[in-house]
Amino acid sequence: MLKITSLSIGLLLNDILSGDTALNKMGVRVFPPKVPEGERMPWIAYRRSDLQQVAVKARNDVYDSVVIEIVVHAQKYAQCIAISEAVRNVMEDGPYRYNDVTGRSIEMGQTLFEGCDEDADLDAYIQTLRFSAKVTSK
């Protein structure tokens, strides 16, 4: 049986973000990289922007270092910041595990906040948060 790897991190991110109480109370919808046209705000979209395999020589082990971007869109600046704070809190609250239907799993531990950019367009305030995470297959 094939194991699942950090290529499946989006499945775990969906579970984490969609299941967060604070984000749900704010009415935030969660999407993978593609958001449906005309989706009403607030929403967040997540994506894996980089993945590097890391060998741990001392333990003869391997893990993946994954860079994750989460983009927050909201109509009001204060709402965008509040959602971004909730995202940061939930992302730094791990470790998290995703189990597929066959019992295979990945674990996302040690998640670090790497930075954030903000922007605006005609109808939205935007925050792009970046995290790096250590992901292992189980």
Language model: regions and residue ranges:
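A general boundary/transition motif marking the beginning of the first structured unit of a protein
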Residues: M1-T5, Q75, D119
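Short amphipathic alpha-helices in soluble, non-transmembrane regions
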Residues: I83-N89
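Short, solvent-exposed beta-strand/turn "edge" segments of beta-rich domains on protein surfaces
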Residues: K57-V62, A120-L122
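Oligomerization/assembly interface segments of phage tail-like spikes and tubes
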Residues: D61-A78, V87, Y125-V135
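Short beta-strand or tight-loop elements
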Residues: P42, V66, G109
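Small/polar-rich, solvent-exposed N-terminal microdomains that initiate assembly or binding
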Residues: M1-N60, A82, G94-R104
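Short, cysteine-centered beta-strand-loop-beta hairpins and adjacent loop/turn segments enriched
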Residues: Q53-A55, Q75, S137-K138
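Acidic-leaning, charged glycine-interspersed low-complexity segments
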Residues: N89-K138
